[in-house]
């Protein structure tokens, strides 16, 4: 019989509810991480699921490392010998980057690509600001500050559009002139990334989604492999993250999301409470 430890009845139910779509909502300090750890252990020990068949997405590297450590220790205490490092555990960005790296030849990126951090991205736009300043309507879009400040504003627009999976062609054909300007800004920026063999924080997920959508075999292999998906802090997910989750889980439909709708009444890097409130029942 599975040892649930100090789990209460609600947690036991969440741990053992392995099949189908599962939504777990709880406030801070109510043992959400504990429940996720036990759930992963339950899948491995009781259901015979291999580590590589489980994906767990978090929002910080610290949280991902904590999950790996706690799952490893829990399994060791139960004398279950598996390699937890084979699990897909990490932030959405690190998981998407892993998928890209494993299938690099099917992306626009070459082997020596460079990943831009926040400063690198801003500096790239600043260095190429002349490509943006002549775009029609750009002055109405940006403040009256200097090029560095305006470059930062451009990056904010770009990141938001990328994370919400906004279609460039739809932007450029919109009736609103300001939206058409945004479309041109995004188009110029993406050309810069392609020319420089670059990828940034906000486009990692976009590139991963494109890879999956454009390569049926890769998608099907991942769908076959990833039988159980668990998403922590689901209230923080944005549109593209939600799309990737349901794309990867489309075959087995075993998706568990953990979130707190009380903490989700804000947007951070595009995150929206809509995702948790609209989760399929």
Which residues does each predicted region cover?
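P-loop NTPase Walker
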Residues: 1-109, 220, 274, 278
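Conserved helicase NTPase motor core
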Residues: 4-16, 20-23, 55, 63-64, ...
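Generic alpha-helical structural context detector
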Residues: 16, 94-97, 101, 156-159, ...
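ATP-hydrolysis module of ASCE/P-loop NTPase motor domains
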Residues: 17-18, 83-86, 105-198, 226
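Non-catalytic alpha-helical coupling and interface elements of nucleotide-dependent molecular machines
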Residues: 45, 72, 76, 100-105, ...
